[in-house]
């Protein structure tokens, strides 16, 4: 496992803390346009992901990339997470990874 450039676990609210840094987020795809995907974060905020994932897209995607603004990620890696995903648990993971247990996450 490459730990030289870790990606912070983020939801919509946490994204603004990491502008210019590598992040990972799970989104529910709302729509896909040329060069971007519009999605809903696990805390119900809209996120724009720049880039073009390989079709077909599933309902949930994990995106790893650089946070450009408080609601935009420039994607480097896209991973289909299927059509069913526990967004509440992932949202809690984001809170833990950015809170008192941050030291446990790369």
UniProtKB/Swiss-Prot annotation:
InterPro entries: NA-bd_OB-fold (IPR012340), Rfa2 (IPR013970)
One Pfam family here: Rep_fac-A_3
Locations listed in the record: Nucleus
GO cellular component: nuclear lumen
UniProt keyword terms in alphabetical order: Acetylation, DNA damage, DNA recombination, DNA repair, DNA replication, DNA-binding, Nucleus
Bilayer-spanning residue ranges: none
Molecular function terms from GO: DNA binding
N-acetylmethionine modified-residue sites: 1
Predominant localisation class: nucleus
SS bonds (residue pairs): none
Family indicated by similarity: Belongs to the replication factor A protein 3 family.
Main function: As part of the replication protein A (RPA/RP-A), a single-stranded DNA-binding heterotrimeric complex, may play an essential role in DNA replication, recombination and repair. Binds and stabilizes single-stranded DNA intermediates, preventing complementary DNA reannealing and recruiting different proteins involved in DNA metabolism.
Assembly with partners or alone: Component of the heterotrimeric canonical replication protein A complex (RPA).
Protein name: Replication protein A 14 kDa subunit B
């Amino acid at each position: 496992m490459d730990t030289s450039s870790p990606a912070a676990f983020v939801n919509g609210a946490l994204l603004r803390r990491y502008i210019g840094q590598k992040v990972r987020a799970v989104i529910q795809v709302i729509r896909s346009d040329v060069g971007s995907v519009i999605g809903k974060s696990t805390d119900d905020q809209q996120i724009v992901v720049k880039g073009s994932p390989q079709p077909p897209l599933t309902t949930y995607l994990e995106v790893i990339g650089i946070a450009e603004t408080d609601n935009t990620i420039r994607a480097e890696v896209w991973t289909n997470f299927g059509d069913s995903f526990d967004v509440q648990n992932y949202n809690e993971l984001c809170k833990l990874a950015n809170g008192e247990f941050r030291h446990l996450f790369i």
